[in-house]
């Protein structure tokens, strides 16, 4: 799929996750949602990324948005990853990379690290796709992007 831009409708998906049942994006209409795509459980940068979110959970909770991590590993891998590092962000299993493909971040069979903020109307309010997998958007960056997206939505 082509690159998604701010204002585009966020592709809906339903996938297994570490929460109850399955995660379905369209069931979150009316709420802000942060989708944090990362390449893999237990890899060095991804572990740093998810641990940074854990260590700054208060900042992420203060932005009043549901945040989920998404990677190609299955729920069993995600549950082990969460337990090993005491992670606080629930994780979605995109084993076939269908979600990554729908969001335009599947490249050569892997996904790019990315943050998408979805507004209460189900539209992309912010996107940050990393060209290289060595850096990630931290909690401060997510909080700032969400504040900016909320301000833009309020301004109409």
Question: Where are each of the predicted segments found?
Answer:
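Chalcogenol-based redox active-site neighborhoods
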Residues: 1-156
């Amino acid at each position: 799929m082509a690159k998604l831009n701010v204002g585009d409708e966020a592709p809906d998906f339903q996938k297994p996750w570490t929460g109850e049942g399955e995660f379905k994006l369209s069931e979150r209409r009316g709420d802000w949602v942060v989708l944090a795509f990362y390449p893999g459980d237990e890899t060095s940068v991804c572990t740093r990324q998810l641990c940074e979110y854990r260590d700054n959970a208060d900042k992420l909770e203060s932005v009043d948005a549901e945040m989920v991590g998404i990677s190609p590993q299955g729920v069993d891998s995600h549950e082990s990853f969460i337990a090993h590092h005491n992670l606080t962000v629930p994780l979605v299993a995109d084993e076939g990379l269908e979600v990554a493909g729908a969001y335009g971040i599947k490249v050569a069979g892997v996904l790019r690290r990315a943050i998408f903020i979805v507004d209460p109307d189900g539209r992309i309010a912010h996107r940050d796709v990393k060209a290289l997998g060595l850096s990630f958007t931290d909690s401060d960056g997510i909080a700032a992007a969400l504040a900016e997206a909320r301000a833009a939505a309020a301004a109409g």
